[in-house]
Regions:
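A short, flexible beta-alpha/helix-coil linker loop
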Residues: 1, 56-57
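Metal-associated gating/positioning segment near the N- to mid-region
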Residues: 1-20
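Active-site mouth loops of central-metabolism enzymes
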Residues: 2-4, 23-35, 110-117
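Alpha-helix capping at helix-to-loop junctions
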Residues: 15, 19-22, 59, 78
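Histidine/acidic residue-rich metal-binding segments in metalloenzymes
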Residues: 37-52, 58-170
Length: 170
């Protein structure tokens, strides 16, 4: 029942899963530009991490405020999982295609609006913040080869920054 941006919604999810799940589970709490205090009060013995959408996505779950991002990376006592797309680049690309082709854009413009440049710029920012604040970061759903250059080689148990891809994106 997304978005899970409050401890109350998170408790509802845990309660529901306790009644219905046949597998081990945990949940992320979702950050927004204005719920950082709430996010930081979560019980991180139960919550697997903080989910951050750095590009607009579901409801109000965008976190594009530099102050909010810095606070999350500086104060998070747990893993930060980011969906990385640079909002300013997305907006500029969308405006460009709307100006050229009108408001009813075809789905073929999706990868042009949410471009490789938008992904790399945002992933770079997340990695820089993780290094600056010594935060544990997981980059969700990498979509460009260039983003791999942001990651270091070595055993996973020694990594501060990890990532994954979705097979259907390859």
């Amino acid at each position: 029942k997304p978005p899970t941006t409050t401890r109350e919604a998170l408790e509802w999810k845990f309660s529901r899963a306790a009644q219905t799940s046949l597998a081990n589970y945990s949940f992320y709490i979702g950050a927004t530009n204005d719920n950082i205090d709430e996010v930081l009060k979560a019980d991180y013995r139960r919550v697997c991490g903080i989910k951050v959408f750095m590009g607009s996505s579901t409801g109000n779950m965008l976190v594009d405020s530099p102050e909010a991002l810095a606070r999350i990376f500086a104060e998070a006592p747990t893993l930060i999982a980011t969906h990385c797309e640079k909002e300013e680049i997305i907006k500029a690309n969308k405006e460009k295609y709307i100006e050229k082709f009108g408001k009813d854009l075809s789905v073929i413009y999706h990868p042009l609006i949410r471009s490789a440049e938008a992904c790399y710029a945002s992933s770079s920012e997340a990695v820089e913040l993780a290094h600056r604040y010594n935060a544990r970061l997981h980059l969700l759903h990498l979509s460009t080869a260039k983003e791999l250059s942001l990651l270091s080689d070595g055993p996973v148990e020694e990594k501060q920054i990890t990532a994954e891809v979705c097979v259907h994106h390859l």
